[in-house]
């Protein structure tokens, strides 16, 4: 069990907010002090231009009194990598799900997404966010029996995504970011959880992280897509429990 002085912090992905974890949090041990945070310009968090990944990591570090277990989803996982590299005294472990060290492809990084594919993927969110975040959730939970109940519970709060400018700047920052040089500086236990059907952060991105984060463990949920903690909430929560309590070494 985590020491009472420690906390578990959950960091959401682009275009979401802390309410993305509303269905996961009740499944985690009641003894854990868990905090889900809003990234700058998302949810209720204020936005000071420009959106900066390092500043976002520093802002979360300022909230942490002692070493904490950090779970980051997608963009939140990228922020978590910067947090662990810049503030190693604040991070006890990392759980990264559907995340990346670099989002866009490069000559030396074929694991990334091609620019046209990335533009097509996010374009819909820019035009009608509320409509497409609901469709995104429906797709993620396609084979989940209580999908409608979950979506009905989290969608109203999740749809409070922040200003269009904040979302655009956060996306621009994610496209520019490259944390590959930080990976060998991270010396904490790392759990990587990826969906086998994820087209946004494909498994190859998780495999890259696994190769370059020493001692990491990669778990693939074959039928999950970009939000394993939603589509496979019980299994995901069990992985988190085992990992944080020392079951995965």
From Swiss-Prot:
GO terms for molecular function: pimelyl-[acyl-carrier protein] methyl ester esterase activity. Its EC number is 3.1.1.85. Belongs to the AB hydrolase superfamily. Carboxylesterase BioH family. Coiled coil: none annotated. SUPFAM superfamilies: alpha/beta-Hydrolases. This is Pimeloyl-[acyl-carrier protein] methyl ester esterase. It holds the Pfam family Abhydrolase_1. Its main location: cytoplasm. Residues 8-232 form the AB hydrolase-1 domain. Keywords: Biotin biosynthesis, Cytoplasm, Hydrolase, Serine esterase. The gene is bioH.
């Amino acid at each position: 069990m985590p020491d009472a002085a420690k906390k578990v912090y959950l960091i959401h992905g682009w275009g979401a907010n802390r309410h993305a974890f509303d269905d996961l949090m009740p499944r985690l041990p009641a003894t854990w002090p868990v905090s889900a945070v809003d990234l700058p310009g998302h949810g209720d968090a204020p936005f000071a231009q420009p959106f900066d990944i390092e500043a976002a990591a520093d802002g979360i570090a300022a909230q942490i009194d002692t070493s904490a277990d950090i779970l980051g989803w997608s963009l939140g996982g990228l922020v978590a990598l910067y947090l662990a590299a810049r503030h190693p005294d604040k991070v006890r472990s990392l759980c990264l799900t559907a995340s990346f060290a670099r989002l866009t492809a490069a000559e030396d990084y074929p694991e990334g997404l091609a620019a046209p594919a990335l533009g097509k993927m996010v374009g819909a969110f820019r035009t009608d966010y509320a409509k497409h975040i609901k469709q995104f959730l429906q797709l993620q939970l396609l084979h989940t029996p209580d999908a409608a109940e979950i979506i009905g519970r989290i969608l109203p709060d999740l749809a409070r995504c922040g200003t269009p400018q904040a979302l655009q700047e956060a996306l621009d920052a994610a496209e520019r970011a490259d944390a590959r040089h930080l990976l060998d500086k991270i010396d904490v236990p790392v759990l990587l959880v990826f969906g086998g059907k994820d087209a946004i952060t494909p498994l190859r991105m998780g495999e890259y992280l696994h190769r370059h984060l020493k001692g990491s463990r990669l778990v693939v949920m074959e039928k999950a897509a970009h939000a394993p903690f939603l589509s496979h909430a019980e299994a995901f929560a069990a992985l988190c429990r085992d990992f944080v309590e020392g079951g995965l070494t």
